[in-house]
């Protein structure tokens, strides 16, 4: 990925030199041309296109902010309701993530959303224990974590 970014920057510099105009707009146009060239060459040079991973990172960040807003709304509803009709609980969520970086990212994203807190991992790192302020359905919570955070993390790292 670093090689592709460097190659894209070189293409942008070459573009600026060919244009004989040293402005940020020309550099940006050259960078976009470089992205297109690398996209076309990815089939011949057999490398994974680096913009795919950058797009996955952008999707992960936007997913986190969406989940953050939804979790804030849920916690506000709980706090402002006259009756404390909640079911707090600890859920063991199985995970497909393997590396320490992936597991740490998942734990951080879960802990940063209001109402949930990642507590610990199992000894074999196949389960993450999560405390939630309201768990009416454990299976739905597990499915939600798999379908949102875990899937997005796997897109970024694979």
Curated annotation (Swiss-Prot):
Q: Which residues form the signal peptide?
A: none
**Pfam families assigned:** MNHE
Q: List the disulfide bonds.
A: none
**Transmembrane among keywords:** yes
Q: Which GO terms describe its biological process?
A: proton transmembrane transport; sodium ion transport
Membrane-crossing residue ranges in chain numbering: 22-41, 54-76
| Principal place of residence | membrane
Which family is this protein grouped under? Belongs to the CPA3 antiporters (TC 2.A.63) subunit E family.
The function of this protein is: Mnh complex is a Na(+)Li(+)/H(+) antiporter involved in Na(+) and/or Li(+) excretion and Na(+) resistance. Na(+)/H(+) antiport consumes a transmembrane electrical potential, and is thus inferred to be electrogenic. Does not transport K(+), Ca(2+) or Mg(2+).
Protein name in the entry = Na(+)/H(+) antiporter subunit E
Q: Which organism is it from?
A: Alkalihalophilus pseudofirmus (strain ATCC BAA-2126 / JCM 17055 / OF4) (Bacillus pseudofirmus)
């Amino acid at each position: 990925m670093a090689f592709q970014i460097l190659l894209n920057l070189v293409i942008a510099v070459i573009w600026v030199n060919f244009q004989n105009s040293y402005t940020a707009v020309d550099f940006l146009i050259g960078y976009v041309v470089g992205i297109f060239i690398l996209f076309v060459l990815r089939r011949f040079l057999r490398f994974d296109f680096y913009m795919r991973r950058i797009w996955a990172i952008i999707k992960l960040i936007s997913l986190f902010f969406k989940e953050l807003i939804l979790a804030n709304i849920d916690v506000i509803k709980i706090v402002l309701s006259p009756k404390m009709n909640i079911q707090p609980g600890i859920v063991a969520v199985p995970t497909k993530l393997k590396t320490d970086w992936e597991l740490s990212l998942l734990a951080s994203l879960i802990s940063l959303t209001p109402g949930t807190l990642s507590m610990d991992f199992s000894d074999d790192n196949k389960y993450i224990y999560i405390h939630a302020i309201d768990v009416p359905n454990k299976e739905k919570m597990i499915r939600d974590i798999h379908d949102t955070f875990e899937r997005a993390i796997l897109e970024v790292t694979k």
